[in-house]
Amino acid sequence: LNRDDDSDLHSPRYSFSEDTKCDDGWFVGTSRRTK
């Protein structure tokens, strides 16, 4: 992950409405984390 601040937002139960971290590989256009 590029930012430690966002590590909290990367929680499995947390879903993003805006997909701004597709570079991390967590968000793939669907704004949802599949890990």
From Swiss-Prot:
GO terms for cellular component: adherens junction; cell-substrate junction; cytoskeleton; cytosol; flotillin complex; focal adhesion; insulin receptor complex; membrane. Plays a role in tyrosine phosphorylation of CBL by linking CBL to the insulin receptor. Required for insulin-stimulated glucose transport. Involved in formation of actin stress fibers and focal adhesions. GO terms for molecular function: insulin receptor binding; protein kinase binding; signaling receptor complex adaptor activity; ubiquitin protein ligase binding. Keywords: Cell junction, Cell membrane, Cytoplasm, Cytoskeleton, Glycoprotein, Membrane, Nucleus, Phosphoprotein, Repeat, SH3 domain, Transport. It comes from Rattus norvegicus (Rat). This is Sorbin and SH3 domain-containing protein 1. Residues 1-8 form the SoHo domain. Residues 22-35 form the SH3 domain. Interacts with the long isoform of AFDN and with VCL. AFDN and VCL bind to SORBS1 in a competitive manner and do not form a ternary complex. Interacts with ABL1, CBL, CBLB and INPPL1/SHIP2 through the third SH3 domain. Interaction with ABL1 occurs only after insulin stimulation while this has no effect on the interaction with INPPL1. Interacts with the insulin receptor but dissociates from it following insulin stimulation. Also interacts with SCA7, PTK2/FAK1 and flotillin. Interacts (via SH3 domain 2) with PXN. GO terms for biological process: acetylcholine receptor signaling pathway; cellular response to insulin stimulus; focal adhesion assembly; insulin receptor signaling pathway; positive regulation of D-glucose import; positive regulation of glycogen biosynthetic process; positive regulation of insulin receptor signaling pathway; positive regulation of lipid biosynthetic process. It comes from the Eukaryota. The modification Phosphoserine is found at residue 15. O-glycosylated. The keyword Transcription does not apply. It is found in: Cell junction, Adherens junction; Cell membrane; Cytoplasm, Cytoskeleton; Cell junction, Focal adhesion.
